[in-house]
Design a protein with these regions (language model features):
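Basic, helix-initiating cap at the start of DNA-binding domains
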Residues: 1-34, 38-47, 53, 64, ...
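Amphipathic alpha-helical segments used for helix-helix packing
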Residues: 66, 70, 99-127
Length: 197
């Protein structure tokens, strides 16, 4: 076997990005139309115009497909070097926009339920995705404390939970539609608190 063929054999066939995109687009459409429970791998395959084997070569479960369809790839740039107040405001507006997307609203409750049923799924679908953001936010907050921009003792994990939790609950549970108002109100509470100064 030639070196090139050995390499192809070890790596497997090249993935066709058009199939990936068709599957993810079909998944987003079906989530909006049918919700998480009503979205199946069969329906995704039919809508995308691909076979089930092509899907299972790429994703081990419906939960993994849905996750990739609604969540962008998380990179370290998720936290910037803005002043800490502006950075927190940016994270709030970004979380509200992400969790307010029509497909994401339908996906989140199902993904959370799946994550509760399996530690492996919880890590793959929830924890690992947020880890980069948590680490970067913690780094930025530590710098802000040193610079006198942020009071000491604010836990970055709790702050991120407050932001994501409020964005998810308001939009996936309460079905709030006014994203701008939600984000502005959440930013005001997070940055300024609720007690009179």
């Amino acid at each position: 076997m030639s070196g090139q063929r050995q390499m192809q054999h070890k790596l497997g066939p090249q993935r066709n990005p058009a199939i990936d995109e068709a599957v993810l687009n079909a998944t987003r459409e079906l989530l909006v139309e049918n919700g998480y429970a009503g979205t199946s791998i069969d329906a995704i395959a039919t809508r995308a115009g691909v076979g089930r084997p092509a899907i299972y070569r790429r994703w081990p479960s419906k939960a993994h497909i849905v996750h990739d369809a609604v969540y962008p790839v998380t990179e370290s740039e998720s936290v910037s070097d803005l002043a800490i107040g502006d950075e927190i405001r940016r994270l709030i507006f970004g979380a509200v926009a992400l969790f307010g997307d029509a497909a994401t609203r339908e996906a989140v409750p199902g993904l959370m339920s799946e994550g509760r049923s399996s530690e492996e799924l919880r890590r793959a679908l929830i924890s690992d995705q947020l880890e980069v953001i948590r680490e970067e936010l913690g780094r930025r907050m530590a710098q802000a404390v040193e610079a006198g921009e942020l009071r000491d003792g604010v836990d970055p994990d709790t702050l991120l939970d407050v932001i994501a939790g409020a964005a998810i609950f308001a939009q996936s549970v309460r079905d709030l539609q006014d994203q701008e108002r939600l984000a502005a109100s959440l930013a005001e509470i997070v940055l300024n608190g609720v007690l009179p100064r």
